[in-house]
Amino acid sequence: MKTRTLVICLLALLAIVAAGIYRFMPQRLAQVPDISLVSVAGEELRLADYRGRPLLVTFWSTTCSSCIAEIPHLIGLYRELSPQGLEIIGIAMAHDPPNQVLGMRKSRGIPYPVTLDIHADAARAFGDIRVTPTSFLFGPDGRVVQHRVGKLDMAGLRLEILAMIASQTNSATDPGLPDT
């Protein structure tokens, strides 16, 4: 009897944990949402305008230690690969006080656009993001190439972006016409 009760309790606990994980996991996203954001510098960022280039969108928070630890790596990635077409947009969560986001952007010297998602519109458009860091890498065609909840694998991400850039470069130099 005790074993049966224990098994039932464990199954109930497992169901509760699974439901909690499901609740906080973003819904599947296939393409860049057609939304506009405004950067903290006042620049309008229409995500559809980023087609044709690799785009990394990362949801972060000033209170998220993993997010803060990623910032120097994202800055390095941006400085290395933005001349070749990479775009990065950081979206601060709705619960982040704007003055803290602005302060962190300035103190960390973040060169890529950072936006405030004050009403959580971007979080909803990306599948109801609730956990940080959550990142999406979109290919030049606007499709999701990589979706990550938690810390990014920076080496793998860099290789993925380099492959996209190389593919674009090869497409631009080789139109697929037969040699004559």
Locations of regions flagged by a protein language model:
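Short, low-complexity, Pro/Ser/Thr/Gly-rich segments in the mature regions of secreted, periplasmic
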Residues: 164-179
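Structural microenvironment flanking redox-active thiols in thiol-disulfide oxidoreductases
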Residues: 68-108, 118-124
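Short active-site neighborhood of thiol/selenol oxidoreductases, capturing the structured segment around
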Residues: 47-65, 74
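Short extracytoplasmic/periplasmic juxtamembrane "stem" segments immediately C-terminal to an N-terminal membrane anchor
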Residues: 33-51
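Short loop/turn microsegments at loop-to-beta-strand junctions
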Residues: 32-33, 55, 132-133
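Thiol/disulfide oxidoreductase modules built on the thioredoxin-like
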Residues: 106-111, 118-162
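N-terminal targeting signals for export/organelle localization
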Residues: 1-38, 176-180
